[in-house]
Amino acid sequence: MGPRGAPLLAVVLVLGLHALVEGEKPSPCRCSRLTPHNRKNCGFPGITSEQCFDLGCCFDSSVAGVPWCFHPLPNQESEQCVMEVSARKNCGYPGISPEDCASRNCCFSNLIFEVPWCFFPQSVEDCHY
């Protein structure tokens, strides 16, 4: 590569790194289903909604005294299954398999002990930014 190719390569590398750092805007359910007092700060004072979403975080400035830019709820296989653990309503029995849970048209996540692993989905109609 000649001297003219080096600046082009530098630009491509910088753009590539920016794409790796920039987050993806979380789904509405991952943001709106998190109660304000459970928000974990993801930004800095004065952050804009655009900057916050670029970090892959949620933004909601409608509640005073809590972080406006905050980490979203964990991703799930279906938007209907995104909810706080405290919102889970049991749809199964202890030791239920993912397959048995799915046959009941319910959500399954066994990442947290002592909460329902098989739980009823929620409508996505209430999800918003």
Swiss-Prot record:
It is found in: Secreted. GO terms for molecular function: CXCR4 chemokine receptor binding. One of its GO terms (cellular component) is extracellular space. Stomach and pancreas. One of its GO terms (biological process) is positive regulation of ERK1 and ERK2 cascade. Disulfide bonds join 29-127, 31-58, 42-57, 52-69, 81-107, 91-106, 101-118. SMART domains: PD. InterPro entries: P_trefoil_chordata, P_trefoil_CS, P_trefoil_dom, P_trefoil_dom_sf. CDD domains: Trefoil. Keywords: Disulfide bond, Repeat, Secreted, Signal. Residues 1-23 form the signal peptide. Gene3D superfamilies: Spasmolytic Protein, domain 1 (4.10.110.10). Residues 29-73, 79-122 form the P-type domain. Inhibits gastrointestinal motility and gastric acid secretion. Could function as a structural component of gastric mucus, possibly by stabilizing glycoproteins in the mucus gel through interactions with carbohydrate side chains. PANTHER family: INTESTINAL TREFOIL FACTOR-RELATED, TREFOIL FACTOR 2. This is Trefoil factor 2. It comes from Mus musculus. The gene is Tff2.
